[in-house]
Amino acid sequence: VGNKVYKIDVSTGKLEKSFGTKGFIESFTLVAPLIYKKKLIIVSPDSISTFDVENGKFLSEKVLNHPEKNFLRGAIWGGIALDRKNGIVFANTGNPQPGNYGVHRPGINHYSCSVLAYDLNSEKILWSFQDVAHDLWDFDIASPPILHDLEIEDKVFEVVISLTKTGNTLILDRNTGKPIFDIEYKRAPSSDLIGDFAYPFQIFLNTPERFSKIEFGHEDYNKLSKAKIHEIKEYLKNAKFGWFETHEFLLSII
């Protein structure tokens, strides 16, 4: 609630006054906390913290701050999942800020638009996998990760699955972060804005088939009335269309 996490006795509905400061600890989170062994796991937008589940004592914090990091956000807000057997927390992260202008945040913007695996025992990030490098399109991963045991040709893979705004279904090995299926890297358009940078390659999945597309064309509204089609074409006559199309001064991108 607000910037506090409370501990409530479910049998009485009252605060556990022995926890933290009279029943609460100061911590802000956008997702529900988890419990692993005797650790309370709280994920804030930019860190993963653990507390003693009995008394609320602070135990550890991992700030998602890579040496390359030169941007705001990349927040954990879409949800987390806990692999109790292996003691790993999986989290999906948001997009870097400023969102549509990347001049002051060159590089891939590590840990943004990514799936992260955090080892609760070693208190280290095991791996990360990025869906969109140097995001300029608000392609944060807005869904929680899903844990699943996937059987392929009589072999079982422990996987984490993330559905992304780009239409990708990322299926990754929980322990290594490696994709279960081959991933293609395709060349993406460069930026026309002076000083801006668009990452030259983005991932493209063939398996599983994308469940939606980010490309848009005139054929996508060809079942409307002639008058409406003409109206839309006029509105979009100066717009740019394409896969990971970049921004241009005074032009819209679709």
Regions found by a protein language model. Give the residues of each.
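Short, solvent-exposed loop/turn and secondary-structure capping segments
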Residues: 9-10, 18, 53, 61-63, ...
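Loop/turn elements at helix/coil->beta-strand transitions in domains of secreted/extracellular proteins
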Residues: 87-88, 122-125, 157, 178
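Beta-propeller blade signature
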Residues: 2, 7-12, 47-56, 108-123, ...
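Aromatic (tryptophan-biased) beta-strands that constitute blades/sheets of beta-rich domains
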Residues: 14-27, 57-66, 124-133, 179-254
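Repeat-blade elements of multi-bladed beta-propeller folds
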Residues: 1-5, 28-48, 72-104, 109, ...
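Phosphate/diphosphate-binding loops
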Residues: 144-193
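Active-site glycine- and acidic-residue-rich loops that bind
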Residues: 65-73
